Amino acid sequence: MEYTLLGKTGLKISRVGLGGIPIQKVDEEQTKKLLHLLAQQGVNYIDTARGYTVSEQYLGYALEGIRSQFVLATKSMSRTKEAMEKDIQISLSNLRTDYIDLYQVHNPSAQDLEQVMAQGGALEALQEAKAAGKIGHIGITLHSADLFAQALELPWVETIMFPYNIVENQGEDYIAACSDKNIGFICMKPLAGGALEDATLALRYVMQNPHVSVVIPGMADEKEVFQNIQAVEDKRPLQADELSKIQEIRKTLGTQFCRRCNYCAPCTQGISIPGVFLMEGYFKRYDLKQWAYSRYSAMAKNASDCVGCGVCESRCPYHLPIREMLKKAKDTFANYK
């Protein structure tokens, strides 16, 4: 297994890690079996989140006796100091540890980020927890390229997590900038949320980029572990047939795939268009139907509120048929009721 340093954190991590979303689909014993296999194979980076229902709890159970073999990262969507303090304590309890290596601000909007950094914001809780030795380092996870650019200039940001894959490469320049600033870059969504069926090709594409510190595909079984490790350790340049397949994937998938750049905003009806498509992806491709449906239903406005004005489509740099895509998402969730 190849290891690298996670930017200025100085943490020594494997180039491939565990993305914790699929843990929600298995049980504690399967999670324990998975983590012991990862430890045997030298995979030492685990990412989870407060928002991934039982993921933290199952990982905590599975880490008993082997916690020291892993670099553990989690994240919270809390934006205030009080709420973040509570979430840090819950994470410590769930994960059955007295120390979390990396705690991240989870997917803030521009407005959320202002709140996080304001007086009484979540950053205060994170910095106090770091000073107290409860967490080691502070990072941020994002889906907006504009916020990625902003995060690069924030002195407290030690790591940045952002989607990067065959069809989502809008953050490439900022990923390179992470190296310049010694910020660890964590690649999420390497399989585009399950939209890319050839996992080996998807991971080989990501690992061609020398500025990626670690890639965190979701894994839930032994086959996926060995397949992903083999792909990440394959250092050959992409071959002609692989490059041809990548172009074909971009041509086919790119016309119906939301990159979550948010240039379509603001929607005239207040719909979070990228949010709708994100939940639709979890529903269809991760097979997390109830989890995705509950989050979709909790949105103040969702796909059913679309009036078909088309303003979003005039702004989309990828010329996506957003109105048609929203109708499909609306039907997907309506049929689940």
Regions found by a protein language model. Give the residues of each.
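Structured C-terminal cap/extension of enzyme domains
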Residues: 39-44, 173-187, 191-337
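Short catalytic-loop micro-motif centered on adjacent basic/acidic residues
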Residues: 44-49, 73-74, 136-139, 159-163, ...
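Conserved residues at the C-terminal ends of beta-strands
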Residues: 19, 49, 103-106, 141, ...
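Glycine/proline-rich, positively charged
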Residues: 29, 40, 79-186, 191-194
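N-terminal binding-site loop/beta-alpha segment at the start of enzyme catalytic domains
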Residues: 1-70
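Short hydrophobic/aromatic-enriched beta-strand-loop microsegments
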Residues: 69-72, 157-165, 236-242
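Alpha-helix-loop-beta-strand connector modules within alpha/beta enzyme cores
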Residues: 56-75, 123-132, 182
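Conserved, mostly hydrophobic/aromatic
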Residues: 6, 18, 46, 59, ...
